[in-house]
Curated annotation (Swiss-Prot):
It catalyses: cytidine(32) in tRNA + S-sulfanyl-L-cysteinyl-[cysteine desulfurase] + AH2 + ATP = 2-thiocytidine(32) in tRNA + L-cysteinyl-[cysteine desulfurase] + A + AMP + diphosphate + H(+). It is an enzyme of class 2 (transferase). This is tRNA-cytidine(32) 2-sulfurtransferase. It comes from Xanthomonas euvesicatoria pv. vesicatoria (strain 85-10). Belongs to the TtcA family. GO terms for molecular function: 4 iron, 4 sulfur cluster binding; ATP binding; magnesium ion binding; sulfurtransferase activity; tRNA binding.
Length: 305
């Protein structure tokens, strides 16, 4: 009896035995994944157009470093030409290492500017001791950056908010403001003068942290508000971290849901015409009673009263 030998299996690429090689391979995969996610977000929301001048708001934190790094890499192979300028707002915080960002940016060869504005003194004077400074600090910082964009021909303002920021903002609005709202990947500023983009909208914070560590970015901690405890955001952040541990994929599903809104399955009358639903044929809308009439009827005395 002739024995049937099994067919030889194709040889897979052997895993590197050297831990350093394994780490390098993992870092390479991570970088490619981030590039793909950033490129997808730019494409999905039309974030960058030919000839755009994109201002990358660089704080010295892991998110903005990663944002700049990704855009620099994509710029070299992007389907459209665009320029970049990195802008940091020096808020005159005590002990702020003002030399770090200029040295880093000169090493990259990227155009940059340092905008000096003493928002630290303003925030410290206005906000009572022990209170979170984040809200006022954010408004002042945004105003200074918008002013720079207005006077320097910037067409897009790129911020470093990531997927977890967007989901956390959704829950903060839900829990504390009773509204369904998050952070838009692309928006026009309230004054209508600026277009703001968030190219990291599809990127997990954990991936950004790992990438920043691998790239050894010179992280600058925020001594004004970044080290303060914003209780609401902290609580939501812990909730998302718990879900990530116990229910992998749940936060990703929530993020995807923000792009699949069904107004007819909610209760916002400004988004869906519930009054027209079920109206027969071409019946004019003026045949519907004034909604206030139903309220009046509910409060009217009964015949037996």
């Amino acid at each position: 009896m002739t024995a049937v030998l099994p067919l030889p299996q194709p040889l897979a690429d052997p895993a590197p035995r050297d831990p350093r090689q394994r780490l390098q391979r993992e870092q390479l995969r991570l970088g490619k994944r981030l590039q793909r996610q950033v490129g997808q977000a730019i494409a999905d929301f039309g974030m960058i157009a030919p000839g755009d001048k994109v201002m990358v708001c660089l704080s010295g934190g892991k998110d903005s470093y990663t944002l700049l790094d990704m855009l620099l890499q994509l710029q070299r192979k992007a389907p459209v030409p665009f320029s970049l300028v990195a802008v940091n707002l020096d808020q005159k915080q005590p002990d702020f290492p003002a030399h770090v960002l200029p040295a880093y940016l000169r090493g990259l060869g990227v155009p940059f500017d340092i905008v000096e504005q003493d928002t630290y003194s303003v925030v410290s004077r206005v906000i009572p001791a022990g209170k979170t400074m984040c809200s006022l600090c954010s408004r002042l910082r945004r105003g200074a950056l918008y002013a720079y964009a207005q006077t320097h021909g910037v067409t897009k303002i790129a911020l470093g908010h990531h997927r977890d920021d967007i989901v956390a903002t959704f829950f903060m609005n839900l829990f504390h403001h009773a509204r369904l709202a998050a952070m838009a990947p692309k928006l026009r500023s309230d004054d209508g003068a600026h277009v703001v983009i968030r190219p990291l909208a599809y990127v997990r914070e954990a991936d950004i942290a790992a990438y920043a560590q691998a790239r050894q970015f010179p992280i600058i901690p925020c001594n004004l508000c970044g080290s303060q405890e914003n209780l609401q955001r902290q609580q939501v952040g812990k909730l998302l971290q718990q879900w990530d541990r116990e229910f992998p994929g749940r936060v990703e599903q929530i993020a995807r849901a923000l792009g699949d809104v069904r107004p007819e399955q909610l209760a916002d009358r400004t988004l869906f015409d519930f009054l027209a639903l079920g109206r027969s044929g071409d019946a004019p809308s003026d045949v519907d009673p004034d909604p206030s009439a139903w309220l009046s009827a509910s409060h009217a005395p009964h015949d037996s009263d």
